[in-house]
Amino acid sequence: MKKLFILFFTTILVQTCTYANNLEYINISFWQKFNDNILVDNLIKVYENNNDLKAAVLKTNEANRIVKMSFANELPHIGFEGYVGRIFKSSDEVFGNITIPNYAETHYYLPLSMNYEVDIWGKNHLITKSKKKQFEIVKQDERSAYIYITSAFAVDYFNLIRCDKLIDYQRQLITLQEQAINSYKIRYEYGTATLSEIDEAEKNLTYMKEDLHKLLEKQDMLKNQISTLLGDRAFKDISRSHYEDLNFSFTTPDSIDFNMLDKRPDRIKSELDLERIGIDVKVARRDLLPKFIITGNLGFNMYNLHSSHKFLADLGIVPVWDLFMGGRKLQMLKLK
Protein backbone atom coordinates (compact mmCIF):
# COMPACT_ATOMS: atom_id res chain seq x y z
CA MET A 1 0.00 0.00 0.00
CA LYS A 2 2.88 2.33 0.84
CA LYS A 3 4.50 1.67 -2.55
CA LEU A 4 1.24 2.43 -4.35
CA PHE A 5 0.93 5.73 -2.47
CA ILE A 6 4.51 6.72 -3.36
CA LEU A 7 3.93 5.81 -7.02
CA PHE A 8 0.70 7.82 -7.11
CA PHE A 9 2.32 10.85 -5.43
CA THR A 10 5.29 10.72 -7.83
CA THR A 11 2.98 10.57 -10.84
CA ILE A 12 1.01 13.60 -9.65
CA LEU A 13 4.24 15.49 -8.93
CA VAL A 14 5.67 14.77 -12.38
CA GLN A 15 2.44 15.83 -14.07
CA THR A 16 2.36 19.05 -12.02
CA CYS A 17 5.96 19.88 -12.90
CA THR A 18 5.30 19.22 -16.58
CA TYR A 19 2.23 21.45 -16.42
CA ALA A 20 4.24 24.24 -14.76
CA ASN A 21 7.04 24.01 -17.31
CA ASN A 22 4.74 24.09 -20.32
CA LEU A 23 2.37 26.72 -18.96
CA GLU A 24 4.86 29.43 -19.90
CA TYR A 25 4.32 28.55 -23.56
CA ILE A 26 0.78 29.91 -23.26
CA ASN A 27 2.05 33.16 -21.67
CA ILE A 28 -0.80 33.46 -19.18
CA SER A 29 0.47 36.82 -17.92
CA PHE A 30 -0.10 38.30 -21.37
CA TRP A 31 -3.66 37.01 -21.64
CA GLN A 32 -4.46 38.29 -18.14
CA LYS A 33 -4.08 41.81 -19.54
CA PHE A 34 -7.40 41.27 -21.31
CA ASN A 35 -9.10 41.28 -17.87
CA ASP A 36 -11.10 38.20 -18.83
CA ASN A 37 -10.90 35.35 -16.33
CA ILE A 38 -13.10 33.17 -18.53
CA LEU A 39 -10.55 33.47 -21.34
CA VAL A 40 -7.71 32.45 -19.00
CA ASP A 41 -9.70 29.48 -17.66
CA ASN A 42 -10.47 28.35 -21.19
CA LEU A 43 -6.81 28.61 -22.18
CA ILE A 44 -5.88 26.35 -19.27
CA LYS A 45 -8.54 23.88 -20.47
CA VAL A 46 -6.97 24.02 -23.92
CA TYR A 47 -3.61 23.08 -22.42
CA GLU A 48 -5.08 20.25 -20.40
CA ASN A 49 -7.30 18.71 -23.09
CA ASN A 50 -6.07 19.65 -26.57
CA ASN A 51 -4.94 16.52 -28.38
CA ASP A 52 -2.42 18.31 -30.60
CA LEU A 53 -0.67 19.74 -27.55
CA LYS A 54 -0.63 16.33 -25.89
CA ALA A 55 0.93 14.85 -29.03
CA ALA A 56 3.57 17.61 -29.05
CA VAL A 57 4.47 16.89 -25.41
CA LEU A 58 4.73 13.15 -26.13
CA LYS A 59 7.05 13.81 -29.07
CA THR A 60 9.26 15.95 -26.83
CA ASN A 61 9.40 13.23 -24.19
CA GLU A 62 10.21 10.67 -26.89
CA ALA A 63 13.07 12.82 -28.21
CA ASN A 64 14.41 13.20 -24.67
CA ARG A 65 14.44 9.42 -24.21
CA ILE A 66 16.28 9.01 -27.51
CA VAL A 67 19.01 11.33 -26.17
CA LYS A 68 19.33 9.18 -23.06
CA MET A 69 19.49 6.02 -25.18
CA SER A 70 22.24 7.56 -27.30
CA PHE A 71 24.21 8.51 -24.18
CA ALA A 72 23.86 4.92 -22.96
CA ASN A 73 25.77 3.78 -26.07
CA GLU A 74 28.78 5.77 -24.81
CA LEU A 75 28.93 3.64 -21.65
CA PRO A 76 30.10 0.03 -21.19
CA HIS A 77 27.46 -2.66 -21.64
CA ILE A 78 27.45 -5.36 -18.99
CA GLY A 79 25.25 -8.42 -19.20
CA PHE A 80 24.88 -12.03 -18.15
CA GLU A 81 25.20 -14.69 -20.83
CA GLY A 82 25.06 -18.01 -19.08
CA TYR A 83 25.12 -21.52 -20.51
CA VAL A 84 24.36 -24.87 -18.95
CA GLY A 85 24.74 -27.91 -21.20
CA ARG A 86 25.43 -31.62 -21.23
CA ILE A 87 27.97 -33.38 -23.43
CA PHE A 88 26.93 -36.98 -23.94
CA LYS A 89 29.11 -39.93 -24.93
CA SER A 90 31.50 -38.87 -27.64
CA SER A 91 34.18 -40.52 -29.72
CA ASP A 92 37.80 -40.55 -28.70
CA GLU A 93 39.69 -37.29 -29.16
CA VAL A 94 43.33 -37.48 -30.23
CA PHE A 95 45.79 -34.66 -29.54
CA GLY A 96 49.13 -35.87 -30.94
CA ASN A 97 50.27 -38.72 -28.75
CA ILE A 98 47.49 -38.09 -26.23
CA THR A 99 44.17 -39.85 -26.60
CA ILE A 100 41.12 -38.82 -24.62
CA PRO A 101 38.58 -41.63 -24.51
CA ASN A 102 34.90 -41.04 -24.91
CA TYR A 103 33.37 -39.17 -22.02
CA ALA A 104 30.24 -37.39 -20.80
CA GLU A 105 30.09 -34.27 -18.66
CA THR A 106 27.98 -31.24 -17.80
CA HIS A 107 29.26 -27.72 -18.44
CA TYR A 108 28.34 -24.67 -16.39
CA TYR A 109 29.27 -21.38 -18.03
CA LEU A 110 28.16 -18.45 -15.85
CA PRO A 111 30.03 -15.24 -16.72
CA LEU A 112 29.34 -11.52 -16.66
CA SER A 113 30.12 -10.15 -20.11
CA MET A 114 31.27 -6.62 -20.82
CA ASN A 115 31.56 -4.76 -24.11
CA TYR A 116 32.78 -1.20 -24.52
CA GLU A 117 33.48 0.65 -27.74
CA VAL A 118 36.45 2.93 -27.19
CA ASP A 119 35.27 6.25 -28.61
CA ILE A 120 38.72 7.39 -29.75
CA TRP A 121 37.26 9.29 -32.72
CA GLY A 122 34.45 10.82 -30.67
CA LYS A 123 31.79 9.39 -32.99
CA ASN A 124 29.43 8.15 -30.29
CA HIS A 125 29.65 11.45 -28.43
CA LEU A 126 28.84 13.31 -31.65
CA ILE A 127 25.82 11.08 -32.17
CA THR A 128 24.60 12.06 -28.71
CA LYS A 129 25.13 15.75 -29.54
CA SER A 130 23.12 15.27 -32.74
CA LYS A 131 20.27 13.69 -30.78
CA LYS A 132 20.36 16.60 -28.33
CA LYS A 133 20.03 19.05 -31.23
CA GLN A 134 17.09 17.03 -32.52
CA PHE A 135 15.57 17.16 -29.04
CA GLU A 136 15.89 20.96 -29.04
CA ILE A 137 14.24 21.06 -32.48
CA VAL A 138 11.30 19.02 -31.22
CA LYS A 139 11.00 21.37 -28.23
CA GLN A 140 10.68 24.29 -30.65
CA ASP A 141 7.97 22.36 -32.50
CA GLU A 142 6.17 21.96 -29.19
CA ARG A 143 6.57 25.67 -28.49
CA SER A 144 5.19 26.49 -31.95
CA ALA A 145 2.19 24.25 -31.30
CA TYR A 146 1.43 26.09 -28.05
CA ILE A 147 1.74 29.50 -29.69
CA TYR A 148 -0.37 28.55 -32.71
CA ILE A 149 -3.16 26.77 -30.84
CA THR A 150 -3.35 29.40 -28.10
CA SER A 151 -3.51 32.22 -30.64
CA ALA A 152 -6.09 30.36 -32.71
CA PHE A 153 -8.26 29.84 -29.65
CA ALA A 154 -8.03 33.51 -28.61
CA VAL A 155 -8.99 34.66 -32.12
CA ASP A 156 -11.99 32.33 -32.25
CA TYR A 157 -12.97 33.30 -28.70
CA PHE A 158 -13.11 37.03 -29.41
CA ASN A 159 -14.72 36.47 -32.81
CA LEU A 160 -17.42 34.47 -31.05
CA ILE A 161 -18.04 37.32 -28.59
CA ARG A 162 -18.17 39.75 -31.52
CA CYS A 163 -20.53 37.42 -33.39
CA ASP A 164 -22.83 37.25 -30.34
CA LYS A 165 -23.07 41.03 -30.32
CA LEU A 166 -23.69 41.21 -34.08
CA ILE A 167 -26.47 38.64 -33.76
CA ASP A 168 -28.04 40.71 -31.00
CA TYR A 169 -27.86 43.85 -33.16
CA GLN A 170 -29.23 41.99 -36.17
CA ARG A 171 -32.22 40.72 -34.20
CA GLN A 172 -32.91 44.25 -33.03
CA LEU A 173 -32.78 45.46 -36.64
CA ILE A 174 -35.22 42.73 -37.68
CA THR A 175 -37.60 43.76 -34.90
CA LEU A 176 -37.41 47.40 -35.99
CA GLN A 177 -37.94 46.41 -39.62
CA GLU A 178 -41.00 44.35 -38.72
CA GLN A 179 -42.37 47.35 -36.83
CA ALA A 180 -41.68 49.52 -39.88
CA ILE A 181 -43.58 47.08 -42.12
CA ASN A 182 -46.57 47.16 -39.77
CA SER A 183 -46.39 50.96 -39.85
CA TYR A 184 -46.36 50.93 -43.67
CA LYS A 185 -49.40 48.64 -43.72
CA ILE A 186 -51.34 50.95 -41.38
CA ARG A 187 -50.39 53.94 -43.47
CA TYR A 188 -51.42 52.05 -46.59
CA GLU A 189 -54.90 51.58 -45.12
CA TYR A 190 -55.11 55.37 -44.70
CA GLY A 191 -53.68 55.97 -48.15
CA THR A 192 -50.37 57.51 -47.03
CA ALA A 193 -48.15 54.60 -48.20
CA THR A 194 -47.89 52.56 -51.37
CA LEU A 195 -47.60 48.83 -52.00
CA SER A 196 -44.13 49.34 -53.46
CA GLU A 197 -42.95 50.78 -50.15
CA ILE A 198 -44.36 47.75 -48.33
CA ASP A 199 -42.70 45.37 -50.81
CA GLU A 200 -39.37 47.18 -50.47
CA ALA A 201 -39.56 47.00 -46.67
CA GLU A 202 -40.41 43.26 -46.75
CA LYS A 203 -37.55 42.64 -49.17
CA ASN A 204 -35.15 44.39 -46.79
CA LEU A 205 -36.55 42.24 -43.98
CA THR A 206 -35.74 39.11 -45.99
CA TYR A 207 -32.15 40.33 -46.49
CA MET A 208 -31.85 41.00 -42.78
CA LYS A 209 -33.04 37.49 -41.93
CA GLU A 210 -30.54 36.04 -44.38
CA ASP A 211 -27.77 38.04 -42.71
CA LEU A 212 -28.94 36.74 -39.34
CA HIS A 213 -28.88 33.18 -40.65
CA LYS A 214 -25.29 33.67 -41.86
CA LEU A 215 -24.28 35.06 -38.48
CA LEU A 216 -25.86 32.08 -36.71
CA GLU A 217 -23.98 29.72 -39.02
CA LYS A 218 -20.73 31.55 -38.29
CA GLN A 219 -21.48 31.38 -34.57
CA ASP A 220 -22.03 27.63 -34.81
CA MET A 221 -18.80 27.23 -36.79
CA LEU A 222 -16.82 29.19 -34.18
CA LYS A 223 -18.31 27.08 -31.40
CA ASN A 224 -17.25 23.91 -33.19
CA GLN A 225 -13.73 25.24 -33.73
CA ILE A 226 -13.42 26.25 -30.08
CA SER A 227 -14.76 22.88 -28.93
CA THR A 228 -12.13 21.17 -31.07
CA LEU A 229 -9.36 23.31 -29.59
CA LEU A 230 -10.69 22.58 -26.11
CA GLY A 231 -10.34 18.88 -26.94
CA ASP A 232 -13.97 18.01 -26.27
CA ARG A 233 -16.78 18.28 -28.82
CA ALA A 234 -19.29 17.34 -26.11
CA PHE A 235 -19.41 20.83 -24.61
CA LYS A 236 -23.01 22.05 -24.78
CA ASP A 237 -22.00 25.70 -24.71
CA ILE A 238 -18.80 27.71 -24.71
CA SER A 239 -18.20 29.83 -21.63
CA ARG A 240 -17.44 33.37 -22.71
CA SER A 241 -17.74 36.97 -21.59
CA HIS A 242 -20.14 39.56 -22.90
CA TYR A 243 -19.01 42.15 -25.39
CA GLU A 244 -19.73 44.97 -22.93
CA ASP A 245 -17.48 43.38 -20.29
CA LEU A 246 -14.34 43.43 -22.44
CA ASN A 247 -11.75 45.81 -21.04
CA PHE A 248 -8.26 45.61 -22.47
CA SER A 249 -5.58 47.11 -20.23
CA PHE A 250 -2.65 47.09 -22.61
CA THR A 251 -1.50 49.26 -25.47
CA THR A 252 -0.25 48.10 -28.83
CA PRO A 253 3.47 48.92 -29.19
CA ASP A 254 4.48 51.35 -31.92
CA SER A 255 7.42 49.15 -32.93
CA ILE A 256 8.84 45.69 -32.31
CA ASP A 257 12.43 45.07 -31.26
CA PHE A 258 14.29 43.37 -34.11
CA ASN A 259 16.01 41.06 -31.62
CA MET A 260 12.64 39.52 -30.83
CA LEU A 261 12.75 37.83 -34.22
CA ASP A 262 15.68 35.74 -33.00
CA LYS A 263 13.36 34.14 -30.46
CA ARG A 264 10.89 32.88 -33.05
CA PRO A 265 10.58 29.08 -32.87
CA ASP A 266 11.00 28.64 -36.63
CA ARG A 267 14.22 30.70 -36.64
CA ILE A 268 15.68 28.82 -33.67
CA LYS A 269 14.64 25.53 -35.27
CA SER A 270 16.43 26.40 -38.54
CA GLU A 271 19.66 27.24 -36.69
CA LEU A 272 19.50 24.03 -34.66
CA ASP A 273 18.83 21.99 -37.79
CA LEU A 274 21.91 23.43 -39.50
CA GLU A 275 24.02 22.60 -36.44
CA ARG A 276 22.60 19.06 -36.37
CA ILE A 277 23.40 18.52 -40.06
CA GLY A 278 27.00 19.63 -39.46
CA ILE A 279 27.33 17.12 -36.63
CA ASP A 280 25.80 14.33 -38.73
CA VAL A 281 28.38 14.97 -41.46
CA LYS A 282 31.18 14.52 -38.90
CA VAL A 283 29.56 11.29 -37.70
CA ALA A 284 29.31 9.95 -41.26
CA ARG A 285 33.00 10.71 -41.87
CA ARG A 286 34.17 9.06 -38.67
CA ASP A 287 32.02 6.04 -39.43
CA LEU A 288 34.56 5.27 -42.19
CA LEU A 289 37.28 4.78 -39.55
CA PRO A 290 37.93 1.54 -37.64
CA LYS A 291 36.33 0.83 -34.28
CA PHE A 292 37.98 -0.71 -31.24
CA ILE A 293 35.81 -2.72 -28.86
CA ILE A 294 37.01 -3.88 -25.46
CA THR A 295 35.38 -7.15 -24.47
CA GLY A 296 35.75 -9.30 -21.40
CA ASN A 297 34.16 -11.97 -19.22
CA LEU A 298 34.24 -12.54 -15.49
CA GLY A 299 32.56 -15.52 -13.85
CA PHE A 300 32.60 -19.29 -13.69
CA ASN A 301 33.42 -21.98 -16.24
CA MET A 302 33.27 -25.44 -14.80
CA TYR A 303 32.14 -28.97 -15.39
CA ASN A 304 31.82 -29.80 -11.70
CA LEU A 305 30.13 -27.58 -9.13
CA HIS A 306 32.65 -28.76 -6.52
CA SER A 307 35.69 -28.15 -8.70
CA SER A 308 38.27 -25.64 -7.48
CA HIS A 309 39.32 -24.74 -11.04
CA LYS A 310 36.24 -22.79 -11.97
CA PHE A 311 37.10 -19.08 -12.03
CA LEU A 312 37.05 -17.46 -15.47
CA ALA A 313 38.38 -14.05 -16.46
CA ASP A 314 39.39 -12.76 -19.85
CA LEU A 315 39.90 -9.37 -21.41
CA GLY A 316 40.66 -8.38 -24.96
CA ILE A 317 40.28 -5.73 -27.61
CA VAL A 318 38.58 -6.32 -30.95
CA PRO A 319 39.42 -4.01 -33.87
CA VAL A 320 36.55 -3.70 -36.37
CA TRP A 321 36.91 -2.03 -39.75
CA ASP A 322 34.34 -2.34 -42.49
CA LEU A 323 36.49 -2.58 -45.62
CA PHE A 324 33.67 -3.10 -48.11
CA MET A 325 29.94 -2.56 -47.67
CA GLY A 326 28.90 -1.86 -51.24
CA GLY A 327 29.46 1.89 -50.89
CA ARG A 328 26.74 2.30 -48.26
CA LYS A 329 28.82 4.45 -45.93
CA LEU A 330 30.01 6.73 -48.75
CA GLN A 331 26.43 7.22 -49.87
CA MET A 332 25.44 7.94 -46.28
CA LEU A 333 28.16 10.61 -46.12
CA LYS A 334 26.89 12.20 -49.36
CA LEU A 335 23.34 12.02 -48.05
CA LYS A 336 24.28 14.03 -44.98
Region spans (language model):
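Sec-dependent N-terminal signal peptides
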Residues: 4-13
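Bacterial Sec-pathway N-terminal export signals of envelope proteins
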Residues: 18-68, 245-275, 322-323
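Small/polar, glycine/serine/threonine/aspartate-rich low-complexity segments that form flexible
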Residues: 22-35, 82-113, 236-253, 259, ...
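Transmembrane beta-barrel architecture of outer-membrane proteins
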Residues: 39-41, 55, 107-111, 155, ...
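Sec/SRP-type N-terminal targeting helices
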Residues: 54-58, 71-72, 118-146, 196-200, ...
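Membrane-embedded beta-strand positions of outer-membrane beta-barrel proteins
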Residues: 78-82, 270, 292-296
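Periplasmic alpha-helical coiled-coil/stalk elements that build and connect Gram-negative outer-membrane
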Residues: 124, 133, 140-256
